[in-house]
């Protein structure tokens, strides 16, 4: 199993709008239907109104690498910069 933790620092007042847009454009639903996707969920920080956590869980790193090349991920990248100031990525494999 392969997991990714993404910590987004959103522009002020943009955190909820980003998640709403991801959902409204059907991106989260499309990701969850991808081959090998076990989990794709966003979480809000209680301490920092600009912080957003994304947890992705995949059957393998190969599945996740195919995922990032999907058209809906290009769509997400096209508007991400309007909402997200910085991104920190952590990853690990469970064997």
Name each model feature, range by range:
Residues 1-2, 95:
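Absolute protein N-terminus
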Residues 2-9, 39-68:
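Short, well-ordered beta-strand segments in beta-rich or mixed alpha/beta enzyme
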Residues 7, 11, 20-24, 46, ...:
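N-terminal/domain-start segments enriched in small and hydrophobic, helix-friendly residues
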Residues 14-37, 72-75:
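Short amphipathic alpha-helical segments
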Residues 22, 67-68, 77-80:
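Short, flexible helix/strand-to-coil boundary loops that buttress conserved ligand/catalytic motifs
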